[in-house]
Amino acid sequence: MTSLENALAVNAGKAVVISIKREWLSKIMSGEKNLEVRKSRPWEISFPFAVFCYETKANGGAGEIIGAFTCEDIDQLNCLTGLSPYYADGEKLSGMADKFIRESCIDIAALFEYGNKTGMLYGWNISNVRKLSLPLHQLHLKRAPQSWQYINLNANDIESVAAAIQ
């Protein structure tokens, strides 16, 4: 059983699908990016959970699920207290802010811009990355999620996913 299949088993087939641009997904697939930064996080799922990556059609993207990973944990970064003072003064970053910048491949200015209105950013820890190729309808989706959404897979779906992993 792969870690992805284990994550699906832990959550009785419940998983998450994210929409992600080609440039960021390439960094995940290559192992360069180990933290996916989002303004929200799933609360109704247990760790580890499976994350399927829908590559958007922007900039020549595939427009289908082309990757998956296991999320073992989610870190939090308060941009107002964890980034703001450092961004303004150019001081050394705190441990969590440094981790977000180093592992997400996002510089401090972009991170601050992304999170300064909501305040809190969530860093989804990426592990066990797998390449696969699935159309959205195979995961019972009619359209790509705006950011992310839950999906529920049955035993046949999980078997199809396992067969699609390269």
Segments predicted by a language model, with ranges:
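Structured alpha/beta reader/binder surfaces that contact nucleic acids or chromatin modification marks
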Residues: 2-166
